[in-house]
Amino acid sequence: MEESEPERKRARTDEVPAGGSRSEAEDEDDEDYVPYVPLRQRRQLLLQKLLQRRRKGAAEEEQQDSGSEPRGDEDDIPLGPQSNVSLLDQHQHLKEKAEARKESAKEKQLKEEEKILESVAEGRALMSVKEMAKGITYDDPIKTSWTPPRYVLSMSEERHERVRKKYHILVEGDGIPPPIKSFKEMKFPAAILRGLKKKGIHHPTPIQIQGIPTILSGRDMIGIAFTGSGKTLVFTLPVIMFCLEQEKRLPFSKREGPYGLIICPSRELARQTHGILEYYCRLLQEDSSPLLRCALCIGGMSVKEQMETIRHGVHMMVATPGRLMDLLQKKMVSLDICRYLALDEADRMIDMGFEGDIRTIFSYFKGQRQTLLFSATMPKKIQNFAKSALVKPVTINVGRAGAASLDVIQEVEYVKEEAKMVYLLECLQKTPPPVLIFAEKKADVDAIHEYLLLKGVEAVAIHGGKDQEERTKAIEAFREGKKDVLVATDVASKGLDFPAIQHVINYDMPEEIENYVHRIGRTGRSGNTGIATTFINKACDESVLMDLKALLLEAKQKVPPVLQVLHCGDESMLDIGGERGCAFCGGLGHRITDCPKLEAMQTKQVSNIGRKDYLAHSSMDF
């Protein structure tokens, strides 16, 4: 039997020689010992290191491009079956990386939106040309003689905050006047208090609790509250008080005035506001107060009639921008002593292209004025722009700007285009009259009106194509209950108050969600409940339907199946940067990057390039 070859051993051994102990030198050698690694394995390790460095460098470059900060070494956890990391840790690591990537996408979206807002924002402030040319700026608001009751002033700021919280009033600004919970504490005369009771108004609404003391204190203000919340009284009652004070100090002479000016986007809204002012002025006169005159200056009316009031000296004026500009340019009206300006439905006026007219009107003021802006829908873009005209403004918001009234039950139904007219008759049976029907086009208004008359329904119609006398008669007949149905375009959707209306029907979905909010706001007013029925079909723009879906969800209303199937991608992106939805139009179903209204505006601007009329005004176009 052959002797087996002795087993080869390494030079180092852990065994201690028998009968002796290891020396200190040998122990030191053991500590310095480095195990032998084969060449092949060393090459693989070197290659892995180089690959890791390359990946790390590429990741850092990518992070620098996206604007995010480079992450530390703790993120470079090797993944896969060869790593010494558990599957649970690997999963957590991947989840964190995905969330970080999502955060950077949101930051990128916000930066892009800021750039878009800057590009669409008006460069010039909403001030007169004269004020901008001379560099005139006002640092302090107008001072008034009104002060809150002493016991209200002695109350703590914590109490005021509790009141605001109770009534869901959001305020922004410095030195905000305290909220006051009764008209008597606001120091209104007994005649006005009796007039309010006659109208069934016993307590102020949330916008009135904070808004009226703010205006009586002389502060500039932006007032945002849902439709039917009593915004009109917020700016009409204070102007009556200011004019009464001026008349008592020094009576108005012939051709003097106005002291207070209220501008409205439509003739019907201006007429309604004028009626409210006349009602309270008449009550004051009956109570032995001086006569306060109020002029109505709107298109479609005789200028001679309007000038008759102005000649005697006028305290207040309610006007539409076009007619007011015409009277100012012809020097029939002077704003030399005007110190109070209220813009009702301000965002709609700026949006509808009246911004140039308003700027021109501002140039006729001779001194500082108290400026007030009111609306139910006021996107961030309009708010930022409007603030340029105000001095230390107070922003009062009751509910989200652009939110639908919670007193309106919204019903959305899918109806084919050809079936709309027949189904309209069915919808009219839901509630007793009066009923308001809205349509986008004038031709549709006329067609619906004709169809209802043929079916024996007592109906009237108004739109921009009808003359002023016909429009006025139609609204008066409907308001007095002589007619059961009013068919209208959006001319009747802004601010008009028909207290008895229980039902609004949208024959078609408006192109902008703001118009929808104004339309349905004609019902469910002053704490009453109303119904709004809206017809939708394939012809509706998907972006507006997404906004409608978001609005229904916000108001906790039933969402029909046809809207439930609509999705806008990553819905978490709709609520970033502290503001939900679009900053340009106020729609909740999209961001400004996908705003159809902005896109339409930009397309229009591009199409108008190169279309300037180079002919002189007096020349003939051959």
Curated annotation (Swiss-Prot):
The gene is DDX41. Keywords: Acetylation, ATP-binding, Cytoplasm, Disease variant, Helicase, Hydrolase, Isopeptide bond, Metal-binding, mRNA processing, mRNA splicing, Nucleotide-binding, Nucleus, Phosphoprotein, RNA-binding, Spliceosome, Ubl conjugation, Zinc, Zinc-finger. There is a cross-link at K416, K442 (Glycyl lysine isopeptide (Lys-Gly) (interchain with G-Cter in SUMO2)). Pfam families: DEAD (PF00270), Helicase_C (PF00271). One of its GO terms (molecular function) is zinc ion binding. Acetylation at Lys-9 regulates the nuclear/cytoplasmic localization. Phosphorylated by BTK; phosphorylation induces binding to dsDNA and STING1. Residues 212-396 form the Helicase ATP-binding domain. This is Probable ATP-dependent RNA helicase DDX41. One of its GO terms (biological process) is cellular response to interferon-beta. It is found in: Nucleus; Cytoplasm. Belongs to the DEAD box helicase family. DDX41 subfamily. There is a cross-link at K9, K115 (Glycyl lysine isopeptide (Lys-Gly) (interchain with G-Cter in ubiquitin)).
